[in-house]
């Protein structure tokens, strides 16, 4: 098994991180107080109680119920900045070099908070992460799939200035997967893509939904990346396609265990994806709720796949860099750093 020191030093990219999912209990309660938010009856009353609840979710919906309550404490641009900045401070110490992060404006606009407030707060934190830590980042605006597509089209309208000027680098699709297949959002994706030819497209698919949802996201939504995608393992033709096109899956091992998608990280088809040359990155998803940030994810995977050597981990890190949406100069610099770290620890 490789050392934690090696995993920490390995340059890491994160592509599946919900900023609202980094809301730790020790920030949630102070923000509730700052903004005079009364948490619902029956909600845990202390950091300790809430941490206990986060240790055991029944399924995706049980988690989402808590997740959406948590978002209610975020009101001002400063709140959104504080949230994202807390994330960047943590992951900087863990060897993160590039982050492409999700946010859910509809969780906030539905409460009367403007998309400008949310986006500007998060973007300020991204700017500071670059100036202070050298971390490059991109914002991915997600549509909530449990919201009517007509409402999602309105969200895209509201976000138009940020899509056109590149503040929003990509469009994503999240929330409860099974009842809301990709075909419902064809018009939304087409509309967003028409606003900026450089807008990247991704979608959550194949987590609780079938492999067919992955194929549909590729065919109908024209995405070039799949978030989760682990159920692709059951479709041999799809695996061939993902390998041929080098379509990256953004896999979230701790999340998959916490939400009972699998019982342990060792059950994930990571070795199969490596063997089939299907590129993937390892990510923390909603780390405040799922018990670990990026280095915790890498460390747990290394325990469950102890036969992976330095070269294998170097390959995983390189696939994450190659699948990122940063420019070639940045990619080449990071790829060289991976080689340096692998060489350092292999001798």
From Swiss-Prot:
Effect of residue 219 to G: In aah1-4; impairs AAH1 degradation during postdiauxic growth and leads to weak interaction with SAF1
Keywords: Cytoplasm, Hydrolase, Metal-binding, Nucleotide metabolism, Nucleus, Ubl conjugation, Zinc
Gene name of this polypeptide: AAH1
Annotated active site: 207 (proton donor)
Protein family according to the UniProt entry: Belongs to the metallo-dependent hydrolases superfamily. Adenosine and AMP deaminases family. Adenine deaminase type 2 subfamily.
GO molecular function: adenine deaminase activity; zinc ion binding
InterPro entries (alphabetical): A/AMP_deam_AS, A_deaminase_dom, ADE, Ado/ade_deaminase, Metal_Hydrolase
BP terms from Gene Ontology: adenine catabolic process; hypoxanthine salvage; nucleotide metabolic process; purine ribonucleoside monophosphate biosynthetic process; purine-containing compound salvage
Binding of substrate, residues: 286
Expression induction: Reduced when grown in a poor nitrogen source medium and strongly down-regulated when cells enter quiescence under nutrient-limiting conditions.
This protein's name: Adenine deaminase
Record-linked Pfam families: A_deaminase
Reported function: Catalyzes the hydrolytic deamination of adenine to hypoxanthine. Plays an important role in the purine salvage pathway and in nitrogen catabolism. Also exhibits a low activity towards N(6)-substituted adenines that are commonly known as the plant hormones cytokinins.
Species this chain originates from: Saccharomyces cerevisiae (strain ATCC 204508 / S288c) (Baker's yeast)
Cofactor(s) demanded: Zn(2+)
Reactions it catalyzes: adenine + H2O + H(+) = hypoxanthine + NH4(+)
Activity relative to temperature: Optimum temperature is 30-37 degrees Celsius.
Keyword Endoplasmic reticulum: no
Extra information: Present with 20700 molecules/cell in log phase SD medium.
Disulfide bonds: none
Binding site for Zn(2+): 16, 18, 204, 285
